[in-house]
């Protein structure tokens, strides 16, 4: 018997979970005929090695979406999971995995939704940016990001993550999805973060009558970088009025109308960052 495909909330070793009682799933395979699971035991430990939940041995063939029932999970914390399973042939095997919690309460975000003072007629994509220095050894770094529009983040010139068309299309006034990225290895002593935002579904041309501005008239960015250092200290770098904004080589961008890029000599226009009114309770993690 072998255990495989262990998942927490449908994902393999996820980060940024906001579920306070995450669910665990796994699969079994065996070369023996008519093999079935007869029991399982789940143990969860925190990043300090403390046991926070031991399910005890459960006589059950259930292996899908088993809910965590231990002590309250801490936010932004790494947890290890071990599942031990027995089958009807007397075999006992284990599988390990992990998950990391995120920010449970949206009001704890320090970032602000920022936009620019560019006119509504400006077709070039705004690029929101900030430079910052790090002078201590980094333990881990997580970037929370979303936008009014569709966004792409670069950190020190490298694209962050593999999402495309993030954060996705929702009823933006009610729900705005955000993504979380592990950027630990991308940080250096001197850093530059840049967020390019296209119109997307938020401001872009949609519908039978090809009308823009279905949800708003200004594209915006919302991001928060959480850095934890080896000495235990933490730092948060969040979008606010101290960021800069400019246009770049993407001169026009529409999901259904195409994109124009000028790589030769784009007309760079610098603007002023404007903080936009935004309800953080609409934020949801996917």
Language-model features, listed with the residues they occupy:
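Short hydrophobic alpha-helix segments
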Residues: 6, 55-56, 96-97, 163, ...
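Non-catalytic, glycine-rich low-complexity segments
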Residues: 1-34, 97-132, 214-216
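Extracellular/lumenal carbohydrate-interaction signature centered on repeated Trp-anchored short motifs
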Residues: 16-18, 73-75, 185-188
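Accessory beta-strand-rich segments of carbohydrate-active enzymes
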Residues: 26, 64-66, 78, 87-89, ...
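Recognizes extended acidic, P/S/T-rich segments that occur
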Residues: 28, 35-78, 84, 88-93, ...
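Conserved small/polar residues in nucleotide/adenosyl-binding loops
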Residues: 284-286
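Extracellular/lumenal ectodomain signal focusing on beta-strand-rich modules
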Residues: 5, 39-41, 70, 82, ...
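Long, charge-dense accessory insertions within large macromolecular proteins
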Residues: 274-276
């Amino acid at each position: 018997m072998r255990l495989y495909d262990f998942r927490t909330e449908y994902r393999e070793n996820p980060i940024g979970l906001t579920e306070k009682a995450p669910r665990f799933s796994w699969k079994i395979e065996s070369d023996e005929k008519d093999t079935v699971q007869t029991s399982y035991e789940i143990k969860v430990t925190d990043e300090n090695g403390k046991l926070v939940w031991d399910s005890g041995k459960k006589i059950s063939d259930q292996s899908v979406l088993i809910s965590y029932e231990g002590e309250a999970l801490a936010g932004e914390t790494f947890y290890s999971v071990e599942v031990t399973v027995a089958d009807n042939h007397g075999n006992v095997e284990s599988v390990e995995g992990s998950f990391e919690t995120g920010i449970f309460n949206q009001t704890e975000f320090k970032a602000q939704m920022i936009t620019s003072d560019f006119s509504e007629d400006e077709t070039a994509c705004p690029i929101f940016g900030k430079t910052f220095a790090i002078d201590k050894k980094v333990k881990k770094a997580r970037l929370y990001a979303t936008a009014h529009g569709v966004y792409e983040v670069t950190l020190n010139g490298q694209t962050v993550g593999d999402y495309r068309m993030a954060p996705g299309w929702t009823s933006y006034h009610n729900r705005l999805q955000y993504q979380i990225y592990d950027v630990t290895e991308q940080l250096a002593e001197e850093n530059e973060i840049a967020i390019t935002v296209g119109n997307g579904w938020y401001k872009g041309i949609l519908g039978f009558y090809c009308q823009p501005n279905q949800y708003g008239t200004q594209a915006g960015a919302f991001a928060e970088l959480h850095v934890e250092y080896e000495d235990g200290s933490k730092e948060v770098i969040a979008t606010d009025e101290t960021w800069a904004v400019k246009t770049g080589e993407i001169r026009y961008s529409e999901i259904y109308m195409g994109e124009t890029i000028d790589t030769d000599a784009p007309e760079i226009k610098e603007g002023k960052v404007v903080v936009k009114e935004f309800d953080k309770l609409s934020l949801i993690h996917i």
